[in-house]
From Swiss-Prot:
UniProt crosslink position (Glycyl lysine isopeptide (Lys-Gly) (interchain with G-Cter in SUMO2)): K556
Record lineage: Eukaryota, Metazoa, Chordata, Craniata, Vertebrata
Disulfide cross-links: none
Catalytic function, reaction form: N(6)-methyl-L-lysyl(20)-[histone H4] + S-adenosyl-L-methionine = N(6),N(6)-dimethyl-L-lysyl(20)-[histone H4] + S-adenosyl-L-homocysteine + H(+); N(6),N(6)-dimethyl-L-lysyl(20)-[histone H4] + S-adenosyl-L-methionine = N(6),N(6),N(6)-trimethyl-L-lysyl(20)-[histone H4] + S-adenosyl-L-homocysteine + H(+); L-lysyl(20)-[histone H4] + S-adenosyl-L-methionine = N(6)-methyl-L-lysyl(20)-[histone H4] + S-adenosyl-L-homocysteine + H(+)
Enzyme Commission number(s) of this protein: 2.1.1.362, 2.1.1.361
Function: Histone methyltransferase that specifically methylates monomethylated 'Lys-20' (H4K20me1) and dimethylated 'Lys-20' (H4K20me2) of histone H4 to produce respectively dimethylated 'Lys-20' (H4K20me2) and trimethylated 'Lys-20' (H4K20me3) and thus regulates transcription and maintenance of genome integrity. In vitro also methylates unmodified 'Lys-20' (H4K20me0) of histone H4 and nucleosomes. H4 'Lys-20' trimethylation represents a specific tag for epigenetic transcriptional repression.
Record-given protein name: Histone-lysine N-methyltransferase KMT5B
UniProt signal peptide: none
Gene3D superfamilies: Histone-lysine N-methyltransferase, SET domain
Record-linked CDD domains: SET_KMT5B
Binding site for Zn(2+): C276, C320, C322, C325
InterPro entries linked to this entry: Hist-Lys_N-MTase_N (IPR041938), KMT5B_SET (IPR044424), SET_dom (IPR001214), SET_dom_sf (IPR046341), Suv4-20/Set9 (IPR039977), Suv4-20_animal (IPR025790)
Pfam families per record: SET
Amino acid sequence: MKWLGDSKNMVVNGRRNGGKLSNDHQQNQSKLQQHSGKDTLKTGRNAVERRSSRCHGNSGFEGQSRYVPSSGMSAKELCENDDLATSLVLDPYLGFQTHKMNTSAFPSRSSRHISKADSFSHNNPVRFRPIKGRQEELKEVIERFKKDEHLEKAFKCLTSGEWARHYFLNKNKMQEKLFKEHVFIYLRMFATDSGFEILPCNRYSSEQNGAKIVATKEWKRNDKIELLVGCIAELSEIEENMLLRHGENDFSVMYSTRKNCAQLWLGPAAFINHDCRPNCKFVSTGRDTACVKALRDIEPGEEISCYYGDGFFGENNEFCECYTCERRGTGAFKSRVGLPAPAPVINSKYGLRETDKRLNRLKKLGDSSKNSDSQSVSSNTDADTTQEKDNATSNRKSSVGVKKSSKSRALTRPSMPRVPAASNSTSPKLVHTNNPRVPKKLRKPAKPLLSKIRLRNHCKRLDQKSASRKLEMGSLVLKEPKVVLYKNLPIKKEREPEGPAHAAVGSGCLTRHAAREHRQNHGRGAHSQGDSLPCTYTTRRSLRTRTGLKETTDIKLEPSPLDGYKNGILEPCPDSGQQPTPEVLEELAPETAHREEASQECPKNDSCLSRKKFRQVKPVKHLAKTEDCSPEHSFPGKDGLPDLPGSHPDQGEPSGTVRVPVSHTDSAPSPVGCSVVAPDSFTKDSFRTAQSKKKRRVTRYDAQLILENSSGIPKLTLRRRHDSSSKTNDHESDGVNSSKISIKLSKDHDSDSNLYVAKLSNGVSAGPGSSSTKLKIQLKRDEESRGPCAEGLHENGVCCSDPLSLLESQMEVDDYSQYEEDSTDESSSSEGEEEEEDCEDDFDDDFIPLPPAKRLRLIVGKDSIDIDISSRRREDQSLRLNA
């Protein structure tokens, strides 16, 4: 050990509590020290002579502390006094017997007799333990001292009893005083101003019952811990042979290279453990005393450690078990032959310095990582974290509970635990705490569950807002109907598993859960919107039943071949290339002849409640008159089944027309011939983007978006052009109750690309990312609904029809104070079509105005639709102003 006062290395065989070597290593080391001591110790001195010569000696290096008087004890006296003092003070307090020198195996006699050579024989190995059976009483004495800190009173209580009279019978006044001072040294450990305490320590393999010194207050660098005292006694060759037993009590012996002698180190400081990166060092406070000095700042609760020496625990401390060796993977923690070498945390060749701040960070990281069991994800940005927290909190229950401000627009959404949507999920912030601290780049968002989150939030908002909206059974009163282009993120197309079985499997799709919820809720869909949950959708059978019940509807909604929802389960139909039959188109749009006229007349007829959006494909070769819904049918049976361009995987993936029954009650007939209703039930437009390896054919569509003011049902007419190779689906998102086909446009303000992306879902099958695709042309109540959808889409990077999205089909006519959102087109869309420029959108009633857009690109599975929206922008804005 390197002492400040000695300025030379001292070989420390010190009292490392629990850090001793195995017996053979200690024996070898002690032998080496003994031999070196024999060679260097002067032979003409005995213990008594040294004791008398240094009784009043002072060290010139550092002044003596008032708490550290020169001991003036011989090595034998120091061993006896230390054993008795620890038995009186420490053992009762700690509850076990600390290490002992056990030199009192000899008869208890004064040092005068012990110094005689004839008394060194081991003839009477009688251990003097006067305090057996008094542990509780002695512990109470220590506890009282911690309160009143009365040294004399505590000493009297500790030494009361018959044993003390016998013990001090052969002691002179000086020896009694030395013993008393030594007990005081141990008692001062429990003073409130000591700044440290002694605690049990079982870390080290060589000791079962060890102890350690822990700071109780903050110590600054170069502070002296004066009460942490070490008492030193020089050892002669005879005393070494007499007192030390290899591997038993030679744990606290140092060799001074300056004095060329072995020294016994006892006292409270003997309980300081070794560390290869210590925070303290020993400094001399007198000829035979020392204390501890802080090498760096020490925080409360941090163990006080010193450096014993380079070879104290074997050669190069190869058997050291300190915390630093554990962290660095050295010493006893170094990998052995055949074991993989642990990578050092910071102790690499070109690593960072082991500063206190870095080590504290590592320590905190380790603690937090233990606490965080399932931190599956973390957001890539702070905005993500905030938004995820909002969404997760709103997901706690599927009942009404609208989450209020989730305006942060993040590109990706952190994944939530994969549990049913109804199950409670902790907010991401909580997850982060649990999860410690996983680097952001290591966090992988789980794709499918985002749509679930999005879906449930949307349903809740719709459910709550439906109460505030005026939705009557006889006639649908729609306040401020607005078509919202919901701007979304770039969409990656991935190959989607075919078949109903894959719906639940792909990308962790929640198809089964959606079906389960549908079974519970679809019965409620027939009720008026005020009663029904927004997250319901109907099956083909229920569609027939409802249509039969609603005789007022002029349009027959024939079951779509693609309508594969039976009992809430998606059944994809094989891709037969079937197109909507003329019957269907006629039934869907009995008054389609007036559709285009209606679209033109809409701004004029608009009663400031509806917005007219006219979107036309750049190459318009065939305008679809497949706009559904006769205004007369009071039941949303007018929910035309738009023939949406469904996702057309080259293999038998479902696509085609889907009949969407509308649970909208008694819509008022549109004088223009096209009733426009802002359906709360726009179905979750999750359209499947199967990223098939086969070459895809791009289908061109003619599109027209019409808003009629009479019934408030927005209508989008999509028709396949003659030159296109795919089939078309008319999309009408008017079905309040449940429409399985929807177009949702979402705008992500954080997205770099300013292109529209729309997803069309024919409601037939759920794709791999089914939970994530919720983009549609929808009437948007809240800006908040935008965030999760866009993010869910982007995060999954997969566009697929989502059964969960259908759950949102039955949305009550809510307060659509929605603004039209532009969505960014996906350059990664399989069509490979170029991204369009800044896309507009109006309808930011009280939200951020969006940049103007010239074209709108709807990406439907493998197909895309280009809609010219620049020509209608001014009219739309004027309509909005009028509204």
